[in-house]
Amino acid sequence: MSKKKLVSILLSAVLCFGMLGSTFSASAAYVSVHLTKNQAVNSSSNVYGTFKYFWGTNSKSSKHSVYYIARYKHNGVWYTGGSTLLAAGREIDEAHAIKTERLDYETDWFLKLNPKGAGTKDCDAWGYMKNA
């Protein structure tokens, strides 16, 4: 095989894998948050986009219901783009995820888990948020 043909094949392979890799990384925006029994609130890291899907599980061992709150940033202020209250022992699976409101611009979002009641603790809950 000639050197020119080998270089051509290698460059084609690099280009194909590079495009494939960027496709997966662009659609893989996903965050999670775990609310432990000694926390009164916990939040995920940020994920960027116009809208999100979120879901989660509130453990049977939790003493309280937990609010799942999707928050987004606009002009430096955080707003609620969707929320639900999950009782202890309940879950929303990914197939039935809640869709946030859709914005006409991209911004940061995060998922906040907050037990019902001021300063309430003693819950074990997981939450997830992803790009559409």
Task: Provide a role label for each language-model segment.
Residues 27-132:
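Post-signal peptide N-terminal regions of Sec-secreted extracellular proteins
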Residues 1-27:
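Sec-dependent N-terminal signal peptides of Gram-positive bacterial secreted proteins and lipoproteins
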